[in-house]
Amino acid sequence: MKKSRSFLLTSLQQAFRMALAAKENTNIPFDEFIESQEYQALSRRNFLRQTTQAVTAGATASIIIPSIQGWAQNRMPKIAIVGAGLGGLNCGHHLKKAGINFTIYEASRRTNGRMMSVKGALAGGTWTEFGGEFIDTDHTEMHQLAKELNLLKLDVDAESERKLTKDLFFFDNKHYTVKQVIQEFLPFANKIKADQESLSDEIDYLHPNNKDFDNLSIDGYLEKIGLTGWLATMLKVAFTGEYGLDTGVQSSLNFLELFSPDTGKRHNKFELFGKSDERYKIIGGNDQIPTKLGEILKDHIVFDSKLVEIQEPKAGGYILKFDGKPEIKADILVLALPFTMLREVQLKKLNIPEWKRRSIAYMGYGTNSKLMMGFQRRQWRSQGYLGFLYHPEVHTGWDNSQLQNNNEGECGYSIFLGGEGGKNLGLNDAEKYLNIIESAFPGTKALHNNKRRIMNWAQNPFSKGSYSCYTTGQWTGIGFAEGIPVGNLYFAGEHASIEFQGFMNGAAQTGRTVAEEIIKKVKA
């Protein structure tokens, strides 16, 4: 089961699970049941889900194409890593610790990929995450790297924050409570659960089961079950922000898998309160992790190296051609760049199977963007809110400077959009979103300090998208083929992860696991 990365979707997941539980506890009045569950939720904050997909290794191991080209015993293989984002850097980091040489080729003039922390962008003494922002409790790769690099973490679930209301749902010009969301789910809970339970245990390109759901969009599914009104709008907003593409093009399996109320079918336990908690940030900026890795690996990185072609000669190995630079040869190749960029590389002379070509060519990518604005103070906190806002035109809004400077003085606020809204978001939209924030938290607009920044990852020439997203037909057409190696060709990055696809943790995880595979191969 995939994990949520957005606050709204996490809240909706929990509301749906509580609606199912309420229907199964008909002997308890609804209000009394909800109150009891809210109490349990508070008492169980430290028992968040630690899911792992143990079957993943076994499922992929059987279809990994074995190495077809060795190298001479009297020399170490030449290893090339393309991409100096977190996946490529963590791969290099583990290779270096194992005493194995390599070179990282990066198209831009910076490391870090889609992680970018900017100091003082919106307010003095603050930092703002222009890219990957939140770290879950079970993002073990990120926690381990932070510990290894002596970086401290900010806990946004600190005691001071629990005293305020976290979420403000603002739809149809009304404020909705979580209790109302649960009530709205009740008529549809059993139907959604039945559809989820009808899903096969394995759905991917090797096991193209449940094509009917895969070929149906989320919009089509909601219409099919008769779910309309403000709850349908809220769900569409949640999934557009979550995956980064409009729900009219997303596979309904994105909805059915992520909203599963019965994780026991695949993970041997029922988790009513299991969720992505988005609890941590690195103090001073998340990009300190890849920045520090880049400093450790500085003698291994070559910048301004845009890959334009990969060839695989009959004699073995790989030939990499770069724009305006000499070609290089490698025995082992790690591609740690998003498929949005890899599909621009000439691969006709690379010996890879058709399923891998389809994955590279067609995998969907979100168009998430952030509009970030500065304010003189946190008006939302004075009104009893942490600042999280959900609105038909705001897929998620939040205080991006939460807990910085003890929540005092100037601050920043992020508007997060996906789909066509994210694709087209620009600084000229600031006035529109200032008015929306004002409608939710009156008095905020007058406190705007006129500092505004934009990060549109779909328009960034080195990413051309935010993170991976399966569109209709892609679960069964190319699903989970991204990270499978082909001979001595490996893939790393968030898109190559199964459990943590779309997360920083997925990039770090795949970088490490690819390095471990190479280490075993080299030292065998």
Features from the language model and the residues they span:
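Dinucleotide-binding Rossmann-like beta1-alpha1 core, especially the glycine-rich loop
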Residues: 123-197
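C-terminal segments that line or cap access tunnels to active or ligand-binding sites in enzymes
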Residues: 341-467
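N-terminal secretory signal peptides
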Residues: 1-46, 69
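N-terminal Rossmann-like FAD-binding beta1-loop-alpha1 element of flavoenzymes
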Residues: 77-104
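N-terminal export signals
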Residues: 40, 46-72
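Core beta-strand elements of the Rossmann-like FAD/NAD(P) dinucleotide-binding domain
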Residues: 324-332
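Glycine-rich FAD pyrophosphate-binding loop
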Residues: 96-118
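Active-site/ligand-binding neighborhood in enzyme catalytic cores
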Residues: 20, 31, 204-309, 313-317, ...
